[in-house]
Amino acid sequence: MPKASEVKKNTAIEFNNNVYLIRDIERSVPQGRSGGSLYRMRMYDVATGSKLDHTFKADEMINLADLSRHEVSFSYIDGDEYVFMDIADYTPYHFNKDSIADEILFINEETQGLQVLTVDGTPVAIELPANVELVIVETDPSIKGASASARTKPAILSTGLSVQVPEYIANGEKIKINTAEHKFMSRADSK
């Protein structure tokens, strides 16, 4: 059993006789206390989808739920459902568009390293790779000789995600995006 300070995002825990998936963690250090940090966790019930916010002390022990990870690839869209296929055994996993709205901005047919998190065989979340490669579909024209400047411009990517990119980047280029920070990392390696 890990302490609250050791728990990460997208971890499934058992709390109040239910299984919750942690979506967000905020750490705070109260002033005037000699005690440790507090961790406010936003969790969603796996069965009902209801939201729960709870604050744990840093050294409070948390029970982990039985969570499995399955490497998947994006398969197709069926109405409001996104379907992902298990790479090992071709099991389809269906997600409602609203439940993975943040992740959709980083997913296309070529995205590799996706994982579906399941609790007792039920898919509960999509875990993104650390970075993804996406194509710029709309940005201001590139400026020659601008590589030395640190100025940026907005760019819209093939999935609809908007990020700031350096001025020397042009339409049609494939770039690497950090999925945790939603930031430009570099040009993608041309293969």
From Swiss-Prot:
UniProt-listed SMART domains: EFP, Elong-fact-P_C
GO molecular function ontology, one term from the record: translation elongation factor activity
Pfam families the UniProt entry points to: EFP, EFP_N, Elong-fact-P_C
Biological processes per GO annotation: peptide biosynthetic process
Record-level GO cellular component terms: cytoplasm
Organism superkingdom: Bacteria
Alphabetical list of NCBIfam families matching this protein: PRK00529.1, PRK04542.1, yeiP
InterPro entries: Elong-fact-P_C, NA-bd_OB-fold, Rib_uL2_dom2, Transl_elong_fac_P/YeiP, Transl_elong_KOW-like, Transl_elong_p-like_YeiP, Transl_elong_P/YeiP_cen, Transl_elong_P/YeiP_CS
Origin organism lineage: Bacteria, Pseudomonadati, Pseudomonadota, Gammaproteobacteria, Alteromonadales
Protein name: Elongation factor P-like protein
Matching Gene3D superfamilies: 2.30.30.30, Nucleic acid-binding proteins
Disulfide bonds: none
Family per record: Belongs to the elongation factor P family.
